[in-house]
Amino acid sequence: MASSALICDTEQWKGLQAHVGEIQKTHLRHLMHDVERCKAMTAEYEGIYLDYSRQRATGETMEKLFKLAEAAKLKEKIEKMFRGDKINSTENRSVLHVALRAPRDEVINSNGVNVVPEVWGVKDKIKQFSETFRSGSWVGATGKALTNVVSVGIGGSFLGPLFVHAALQTDPEAAESAKGRQLRFLANVDPVDVARSIKDLDPETTLVVVVSKTFTTAETMLNARTLKEWIVSSLGPDAVAKHMIAVSTNLELVEKFGIDPKNAFAFWDWVGGRYSVCSAVGVLPLSLQYGFPIVQKFLEGAASIDKHFRSSSFEKNIPVLLGLLSVWNVSFLGYPARAILPYSQALEKFAPHIQQLSMESNGKGVSIDGVQLPFESGEIDFGEPGTNGQHSFYQLIHQGRVIPCDFIGVVKSQQPVYLKGEIVSNHDELMSNFFAQPDALAYGKTPEQLHSEKVPEHLIPHKTFQGNRPSLSLLLPSLSAYEIGQLLAIYEHRIAVQGFLWGINSFDQWGVELGKSLASQVRKSLHASRVEGKPVLGFNSSTTSLLTRYLAVEPSTPYNTTTLPKV
């Protein structure tokens, strides 16, 4: 029977609710005058510096949040995750993405078995295969070396690896390793995405990686069959074994598809898709592009944060502090969204990955025991690199809705540029905005200041900034593979902390199932109408009307022959 105990029933939660009234009487422009408060609201680990002094919080707020963490048994829940306890209770699974980057000699158990040797077995296999591939020893059906890789997956099999790939592309060491190679990702079942993923590629020099744990994911397998046809139509059916490999545990279906099971790389049911970047899902395609040593540095960066998260006191624990502040903003101050604003173009795919990681993990309406939550949980995550975002949606953040912001900056640019005679370098210009925006949000601009600047009276309401808008700043020393791994793990653990505090299961995703089930019904109806001429039946009037309108137009691809992209 489900327990009715909820975190909101605790004295610590109620104490924070009462404390909101005190915070609402404050303004950040005054709180920021307290130098000791500002100093206290920082944390540092391996050169990563967190400043959360621009949060609508005081030392008392933080003490109350630490007590809430204690009431939620946060330390115990973190330990259970690292121990391999089945904290994903709805699927009866361990949650062990930390094992994917653990040192070879570490012991992490699932069902009483140390999984680390098996993880390293797969990594060793990836290392060997990627070295063979990159050396030119692995050749395609015509004897040519393969230099292009298309990774086919969706959701966590796509967004996480894409984020890391985008971040590594301009890192000098990684870029040097990737010279003469291309890595592309195919996720959307939209044929336009297929066309884009293979545009200007030659099947002769292309390897396709199919990422599907069960080898049954509808979108991924249709895309895989499409690329298989692209290869076969050019090189013949025997080419599949040389031009396609898999990340899957279903070796029977892998072999049936035409891929040699020896070229299938495993991952496990204790790895959720959105937490799978450090498994073969990400490590294999990234190693083919950049070489395993680069990817191992990425894994080591993530492992360093795992250690920090597990062992540091909450007062100086970066993922814990971030998670606590998110709960404070969402559940107590009533801010439902968060803007992720990396001042680094290399991190352009970071916000989309965190959007999935956060919203799929914590977009839940019931507790882990199945009790309806009577409070707000989960966040709406979005973002764009600075300074692009400043010319896009910052207007709303400054003068519209209050949206807490994560500003992420990098001390050393991957690609430094300076033009002689300019006031600052290109990177300093970028970072000038990184340092200025949090203060603009916190302090705002008062009518009195505008009067002193002799702004016309009729413009004063339009140029007034209320300020008091919370943000935090995360400053990374550089953006090598190691720091990219650290950044990923910080956000993975932050999101877990939020779920642990809210008392929800951050590691299942039942919300995606209903739509998939309904899509299956529509798929059958489309087939019956296209092939057998049957009318649309079994849907409500609105859906029937939409389907009828869609089917009234002759399809651009006849159903009696194969059609591949023309781009």
Curated annotation (Swiss-Prot):
Database matches in CDD domains: SIS_PGI_1, SIS_PGI_2
Any GO CC annotation of this UniProt entry: cytosol
Pathway connected to this protein: Carbohydrate degradation; glycolysis; D-glyceraldehyde 3-phosphate and glycerone phosphate from D-glucose: step 2/4
Domain of life: Eukaryota
Keyword Isomerase in annotation: yes
One annotated GO molecular function: glucose-6-phosphate isomerase activity
Catalytic activity: alpha-D-glucose 6-phosphate = beta-D-fructose 6-phosphate
Alphabetized Pfam families for the sequence: PGI
E.C. code: 5.3.1.9
Predominant location: cytoplasm
Binding site for D-glucose 6-phosphate: G156, S157, S212, K213, T214, F215, T216, T217, Q356, E360, H391, K516
Keyword Isomerase: yes
Keywords: Cytoplasm, Gluconeogenesis, Glycolysis, Isomerase
GO biological process annotation, one example: glucose 6-phosphate metabolic process
Subcellular location: Cytoplasm
EC category: isomerase
Catalytic center residues: E360 (proton donor), H391, K516
Subunit structure: Homodimer.
Protein family (similarity comment): Belongs to the GPI family.
Job of this protein: Catalyzes the conversion of glucose-6-phosphate to fructose-6-phosphate, the second step in glycolysis, and the reverse reaction during gluconeogenesis.
NCBIfam families: PRK00179.1
Protein name as catalogued: Glucose-6-phosphate isomerase, cytosolic A
Source organism (scientific name): Oryza sativa subsp. japonica (Rice)
